[in-house]
Amino acid sequence: SSAASDVYKRQISTQANNTNYMTYKFWYEHGAKRVVSARELSLAEISEIRANIPDDMEIESFVHGAMCISYSGRCLLSNYFTGRDANHGACTHPCRWKYSIVEETRPGEYMTVNEDDRGTYIFNSKDLCMIEYVPEMVAAGIDSLKIEGRMKTALYVATVARTYRKAIDDYFESEEKYRSNMEYYKSEIAKCTYRQFTTGFYFGKTDSDSQIYDSNTYVKNYTYIGTVRQVTDDGCVCFEQKNKFSVGECVEAMDFNGDNIECTVEAIYDEDGALMESAPCLLYTSPSPRDGLLSR
């Protein structure tokens, strides 16, 4: 209904194969106000779309995260192998798994195509990272930057989203400020699990450098250990633990206001107030800074 359209803005997924301005116009004529561009588009092609669609139509484009190996994300591997549908936001990333080649008349005989002793990574794309190119994305006429976050932790989502938010705000305040803070942006993103980075298709066709051939693992510099749920009157926090940690370890708290605070775990108490040396995945209270996410 028209009333519903006024309340809920219709947005079209990247999986609708939105690769040219005629597609955008089609969706606009059917009530869509925002369309997510296909990952295969370059910034030049997005600029062309922007120049040929209504001014009040919004373009959303991916700025960071895993790159789907399938065209416009339309992949059935996850659904076929695990019953979890990528087209409904539940992709299990089978493109990251190891694969071997078997000739159908020789079952059990694996071809020697391995890059290492664990398999060959024929679908293993690097992760997209456009933190250095926010001005170019703005200049292309993109209205919203999309961060891919499937199967990611709260720490990943919070850190990456906060970093790009700061980068965008810094750029609109001053390009000089944005450039001067680049190492900070990169260091924050490096705290999350990630693969090697690429700029995807934004500057033209990809080449062999956009793939990872020797590993299927993530780079992991920090461990997400928990989420602060409550701050007590005596300066402690009650938090939900995600990974084990111990008294004496140095941890970093990511505050909601954007600050990172390093501190040492002085003590850990269980729900009954008993002291513990380490925390094996329950609810705990510990002296710590304000609300936020904890990592080490």
Model-derived segments and spans:
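Surface-exposed amphipathic alpha-helical tracts and adjacent flexible/coil segments at the periphery
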Residues: 25-286, 290, 296
